[in-house]
Amino acid sequence: GNFETIFPMMREDGFGAVELHLWDSREIDRKKLDNELKKNSLTLTSIGTGGAYGTWHLNIADHDKDIRKKAIECLKEHMITASPYEGVIIIGSMQGRFKDAGSPEEFVNNVEESLDILDRMAQEYGVYIGYELMNHYESDFLFRIEDGIRFLNEHSYKRTGIHIDTVHMNVD
């Protein structure tokens, strides 16, 4: 639904924050979003990005550099939207699958390269990246919390952390 309908309902139900699931942040009126959040005493905590993978197959691991570039641009637009709230940009489905990269090794290399770029952007926009650990039915990489922590500890990301979704954790 639209912000004008959903946000008052959320406020009335006692919510103080919202996670939006957006395909493309350029398609929303950011000023209107901000006004509606303020009017309803809400803040934006995070943006879920999986729709861009499901709809356009944008992902940060793809063998095709142009697809990775478009995925990073899409995520940058979400950072601009989340910036006033120091929000989290959740990368779940947009991490892609091994088949998108061509091999597990290329997948990991492309994810690391993309996260390096995105982490620097997150610093610039004052937001955070939440790398979502997903279950083995929906992801090929990092299913368990300890694996995600190990992966992050191998890198020097400043604004990237693990996003833990209990739906996925209950599977693995």
PLM-predicted stretches and their roles:
Residues 1, 20-32, 98-100, 136-142, ...:
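Acidic-and-aromatic substrate-binding clefts and catalytic sites of carbohydrate-active enzymes
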Residues 1-83, 116, 157:
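N-terminal pre-domain/capping segments
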Residues 20-24, 46-51, 91-94, 131-135, ...:
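A cross-domain feature marking catalytic cores of carbohydrate-active enzymes
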Residues 61-161, 171:
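Active-site acidic/histidine proton-transfer and metal-coordination neighborhood
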